[in-house]
Amino acid sequence: MHEWALADAIVRTVLDYAQREGAKRVKAVRVVLGELQDVAEDIVKFAMEQMFAGTIAEGAEIIFEEEEAVFKCRNCGHTWKLKEVKDRFDERIKEDIHFIPEVVHAFLACPKCGSHDFEVVQGRGVYVAGIMIEKEGEA
C-alpha cells in the first residue's frame, strides 16, 4: 500500500506540472528512488501506469533511478554506504525503515566510532527528477 501512496504523489506532481506548462501529453517521467526507502519499483510503476490511464500521461515512459544511501557521522565525520552494513538488518527492520526511514538511527551506528548521531547524506526519499512533456504544435 505504501508504494501506491508514493505513486499517487508522483502522478499528482507530474499531472500538476504538465497542466501548469500547458502540455498536450507527458512523454516521460524520471523518478529517483532512495535506496534507504527500499521501495518496490515494479509496484510503483504498475500503480503509476494505472493512475496515468485516461490522462495526458497515459503511455508515458517511466524511468527509475536508484540513489545509493550514504551516511555521515556527526561525531567523527566518517562516511559510509548502506550496502556496507545492510546485512545487519533482518526483514522486520527493513520493513520498519521502509515505512519510517528516520528509524534507521535506532538500528544503525557509525561503523568507525559507534555513534548513532549521523545524517543521511543521500538516498533517503523518492522524488521526481524530470518530466518530459509535449506542447501543442510540437512533435
From Swiss-Prot:
Domain of life of the native organism: Archaea
Keyword Zinc: yes
Keywords on record: Metal-binding, Nickel, Zinc
Binding, Ni(2+): H2
InterPro entries from the UniProt entry: Hydgase_Ni_incorp_HypA/HybF_CS, HypA/HybF
GO molecular-function term, one example from the UniProt record: zinc ion binding
Pfam families: HypA
GO biological process: protein maturation; protein modification process
Annotated Zn(2+) binding sites: C73, C76, C110, C113
HAMAP family with a match to the protein in the record: HypA_HybF
Purpose: Involved in the maturation of [NiFe] hydrogenases. Required for nickel insertion into the metal center of the hydrogenase.
Similarity annotation: Belongs to the HypA/HybF family.
PANTHER family found in the cross-reference section: HYDROGENASE MATURATION FACTOR HYPA
Record-given protein name: Hydrogenase maturation factor HypA
Organism: Thermococcus gammatolerans (strain DSM 15229 / JCM 11827 / EJ3)
Gene that this sequence comes from: hypA
